[in-house]
Amino acid sequence: NPCCDAATCKLKSGSQCGHGDCCEQCKFSKSGTECRASMSECDPAEHCTGQSSECPADVFHKNGQPCLDNYGYCYNGNCPIMYHQCYDLFGADVYEAEDSCFERNQKGNYYGYCRKENGNKIPCAPEDVKCGRLYCKDNSPGQNNPCKMFYSNEDEHKGMVLPGTKCADGKVCSNRQ
C-alpha cells in the first residue's frame, strides 16, 4: 500500500488514509464524491464526507414513502411493484393481471392462496387477494393468457407477491396479508 509505511504499519507522513471507498491517492475523497450508487428510487446514493475514508452507512427512504409515481411504496430500499415482479418471472410484454385474476387467491388451492400452514394452502381474505399468488397478463406475441401464474415445487415463495408490494392505496403486503 503506497499510503502506509510497511516497517511501522502506520500511514506515511502526509497520508490521511490507506484504504476505503472514500480514499483516493492517500487522501480523503472530496466531500460529495459518490461512494455507493443508488440501487433504486428508495435507496439514495451515498457520498463521501471529506472527513473519512469510509463511505457513510447505506440508508434508505422510509418504508411507506410513495415511489414510482405512486405505483408503489418504499420497502427496505426497494420499490416493489407487481409489474416488475411479472417482468422478472416472465420477461417483456407481461404485466400485472386484472383484479379478477387475484380473486382466485380466495380458493386456497394450487392456483391461488395466501400462505401455507402445515403444508395446507390457506385462502386469502377478500381484502388480501393481492398479497398471495402473483397473477400476470401475458401480452407477448402468440400469447393470450390474462391470468398467468408461476409455480415452483423447489421454491414455494417464487411466484408469490413480494412483501412490501402495494396492494391498495395506502396498503402494502406484509406476511401475505
From Swiss-Prot:
Its main location: secreted. Its cofactor is Zn(2+). Keywords: Calcium, Disulfide bond, Glycoprotein, Hemostasis impairing toxin, Hydrolase, Metal-binding, Metalloprotease, Protease, Secreted, Toxin, Zinc. A motif (D/ECD-tripeptide) lies at residues 41-43. GO terms for molecular function: metal ion binding; metallopeptidase activity; toxin activity. GO terms for cellular component: extracellular region; plasma membrane. It is found in: Secreted. Binds 1 zinc ion per subunit. GO terms for biological process: proteolysis. Glycosylated. Residues 1-63 form the Disintegrin domain. Its EC number is 3.4.24.-. Signal peptide: none annotated. The keyword Disulfide bond applies. Ca(2+) binds at residues 43-44, 46, 58-59. Expressed by the venom gland. Disulfide bonds join 3-26, 17-23, 22-48, 35-55, 42-74, 67-79, 86-136, 101-147, 114-124, 131-173. SUPFAM superfamilies: Blood coagulation inhibitor (disintegrin). Snake venom metalloproteinase that impairs hemostasis in the envenomed animal. Belongs to the venom metalloproteinase (M12B) family. P-III subfamily. P-IIIa sub-subfamily. Monomer. This is Zinc metalloproteinase-disintegrin-like scutiarin. It comes from Crotalus scutulatus scutulatus.
